[in-house]
Amino acid sequence: MAEEEVDYVFKVVLNGDSAVGKSQLRARFTRDEFSMDSKATIRCRFQYSNAPYYKGAVGAMLVYDMTIRESFEHIPQWLEELRVHADKNIVIILIGNKTDLENQRSVPVEDAKEFAEKEGLFFLETSALNSTNVENSFNTLLTEIFNKVNKKNLAKTTVSCSSQVSLLRPPCVAAQ
C-alpha cells in the first residue's frame, strides 16, 4: 500500500471521565470500528499535572456521557485543566456521547448548549455505537483548527513581507 501524502498533522486530545466513550469515538472515526466488549481505559483524574499530554495539542474534545450527569458536571474541571496546560488558542468541542441511549438521558441538550456557549466551545452530540455525528464532530474540530492555522500563517506571511528577515515555523504541528 502506498503511503498517503499528508499536508498537515494536528494533535487532538480527548478528555473526560472514564467510560464516557473517548476511545470508542477515536476508533469509530479512525477505523470505523466499535467494540461492544471494550474495557474502560484508565487515563487520569484532576490530581496530577498533565502538561506533557497537552504539549503541541491544537484541538480538544471534552467528552461526557449524556446518560451520566456526573460526567457532565466534571466538564468544567476538564476544561480548566485544558486551559491551564494547553495552548491558549486550542480549539475545543464539547461532545455529549451515547445518544443511542436517549431513553436514559440525564443531561438535557439545553444544559450542554448553554455551557458550550458560555465557554465559547463548539457542541455536538454523538453516538460511537451507531456512528451518529462522529465524523461530523471531528470534521468540525479539524476544520476550525485548519482555519486558525491558515489565519495564523496569513498573518505571519503579511508580517514577513514587510521585514527583511523572517523565520517562520512550518504550518503544521507534529503529532506525538
From Swiss-Prot:
Disulfide bonds: none annotated. It comes from the Eukaryota. GO terms for molecular function: GTP binding; GTPase activity. Pfam families: Ras. GO terms for cellular component: endosome; Golgi apparatus. SUPFAM superfamilies: P-loop containing nucleoside triphosphate hydrolases. PANTHER family: DRAB11-RELATED. Belongs to the small GTPase superfamily. Rab family. This is Putative Ras-related protein RABA4e. The lineage of its organism: Eukaryota, Viridiplantae, Streptophyta, Embryophyta, Tracheophyta.
